[in-house]
UniProtKB/Swiss-Prot annotation:
It comes from Lactococcus lactis subsp. cremoris (strain SK11). Pathway: Carbohydrate degradation; pentose phosphate pathway; D-ribose 5-phosphate from D-ribulose 5-phosphate (non-oxidative stage): step 1/1. Catalyzes the reversible conversion of ribose-5-phosphate to ribulose 5-phosphate. Its EC number is 5.3.1.6. It comes from the Bacteria. NCBIfam families: PRK00702.1 (NF001924), rpiA (TIGR00021). Belongs to the ribose 5-phosphate isomerase family. InterPro entries: NagB/RpiA_transferase-like (IPR037171), Ribose-5P_isomerase (IPR050262), Ribose5P_isomerase_typA_subgr (IPR020672), Ribose5P_isomerase_type_A (IPR004788). One of its GO terms (molecular function) is ribose-5-phosphate isomerase activity. It catalyses: aldehydo-D-ribose 5-phosphate = D-ribulose 5-phosphate. The active site is at 104 (proton acceptor). This is Ribose-5-phosphate isomerase A. The gene is rpiA. CDD domains: RPI_A.
Length: 224
């Protein structure tokens, strides 16, 4: 599995050229992309500016010598590469397993091009096998949790290693929704967007046109 992740990370790095502002995703697969960019910066004198999507990715990029800027310090991002937790047949996706969904969606929104890198296990006909993360303001979050229970979304709190409620980089909580099959991802996204106290959710609908997939038969690119 790790070899598949590394393959797509290296493949995605081929789309990066000197002079680009590059969005650096978060997660185990995106980490291989960042690692390959670091190698190219050191060995090929690749000149880029990275915009990170989490404190974890910032630390990795700094250690690799990749120059960084905030999303607010650049005019736009040329290309963002990130992983995904689940992708349906229309290239809608669920992200946020690494608790970085808010920063990931902000960087993706201001990117000219956006690519996901995954192994084939992340592909499915419909979304729903992976939990939908919802980042929420801490104040009033128990009330939101009850709302999700009433909607039969089987909510659970995202916890840290100590068993306490995880706090995101932006100082929010995450409530994970467990919905067996999401027939209409956009309808669910619209519903969540209207809920007071919801900061962002992990439904990334109609945001990517290209997915790089690694599988038993090698690396392939799915475009839409």
């Amino acid at each position: 599995m790790e070899n598949l992740k590394k393959q797509v990370g290296i493949k995605a790095a081929e789309f990066v050229k000197s002079g680009m502002v590059v969005g650096l995703g978060t997660g185990s697969t995106a980490a291989y992309f960042v690692e390959e960019l670091g190698r190219r910066v050191a060995e090929e004198q690749l000149e880029i500016t990275g915009v990170t999507t989490s404190s974890v990715t910032s630390e990795q990029a700094k250690a690799l010598g990749i120059p960084l800027a905030s999303i607010d310090e650049v005019d736009y991002v040329d290309l963002t590469v990130d992983g995904a937790d689940e992708i349906d047949s229309h290239l809608n996706g669920i992200k946020g397993g690494g608790a970085a969904l808010l920063m990931e969606k902000i960087v993706a929104t201001y990117s000219k091009d956006y690519i996901w890198i995954v192994d084939e296990s992340k592909l499915s006909e419909n979304l729903g096998s992976f939990k939908v993360p919802v980042e929420v303001i801490r104040y009033g979050s128990e009330q939101l949790f009850k709302e999700f229970e009433r909607a039969a979304y089987a909510p659970t709190w995202r916890l840290n290693e100590e068993g306490e409620k995880l706090i995101t980089d932006m100082q929010h909580f995450i409530i994970d929704l467990h919905i067996a099959k999401i027939e209409n991802p956009q309808k669910l996204a619209d519903e969540l967007d209207l809920m007071v106290g919801v900061v962002e959710h992990g439904l990334f609908n109609d945001m990517v046109k290209k997915v790089i997939v690694a599988g038993s038969d090698g690396v392939k690119i799915i475009s839409q």
